[in-house]
Amino acid sequence: MGFFSLMQELAIDLGTANTLIIYNGKVVVDEPSIIALELQSGKVKAIGTEAKKMDGRVHPNIKTIRPLKDGVIADFKATELMLRGLIKKVRTTSSMFSPSLRMVICIPSGSTNVEIRAVRDSAEHAGARDVYMIFEPMAAALGAGLDVEAPEGNMVIDIGGGTSEIACISLGGIVCSESINVAGDVFTTDIQNYVRQQHNIRIGERTAEEIKHAIGAAISDLDEEPEDFVLTGPNMLTALPQTVTLSYNEIAYALEKSLVKLDAALMTVLETMPPELYADIVKNGIYLAGGGALIKGLDKRLSNKSGLPVHIAEDPLRAVARGTSIAMKNVDKFSFLMHDN
């Protein structure tokens, strides 16, 4: 982009758990999708990482809000404020003029027209002049390096914070797909519930996420076993500190009921897929993206379930953001981008 360009282009992965912003092919913002507000004044106290540090530690006059739930906007005003604040963190120009903003934002493939409108309105209120949107499975496929416009089938499973999206893509379109509200946030809750029920220890979301990242597993026979996780928390009966050691096998057990739903959604898409595209998937395999792709052994589990090869996309946490950035560079080429003139 030239020095005198009046259009600033941002690719945004507006996720339930994290929001990523890419400018000039680089991730310039990667922060939790959370905002802290002062209740009486409505003033923004913190956004992103700083707000996440406050979560669970605030007094009654400050509230932390996660504006997105299950991949869609749950709080319009908070989303607008969060987006505006995160965009301000993008130091992209030294010009004395404020450039117009063009955004490409990824959204769940099951989004309703009302939900799509809410994303567009939030972007426009945050300063966007021109807004394009791309469905998350398409962005994940682009970010995984797949040719989404080729006359052959490609399959992606994008496991984010609020939703898991499973889609078969061919010729620039989503042929068949499933979107379920079983993803990272549900896995975190599963771990909280397990620790409470099995060990009588109450843990917060942040601790459960630490456990998930350290020993989260989809199968109980990993080739490389992670070290056990030592946890100290308040016993629910005595309120005294209690220490337990958690193994990855326990977490695999804790996640099992949710993972069975993911298995079923995958099989539903495979069963509804045209035979010609199925043959392509047998050859090309399935690509995993999103934070959930980092659950240990998930690729092996899904491969065993489907009988198909399963690959983890490079840097799966940023695959959707990468794909959104690729879409930004090709807004005039990709006919599958949604845009209101």
Q: What spans do the regions from the language model cover?
A:
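Nucleotide/phosphate-binding catalytic cleft detector across ATP-hydrolyzing
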Residues: 1-159, 167-286, 293-341
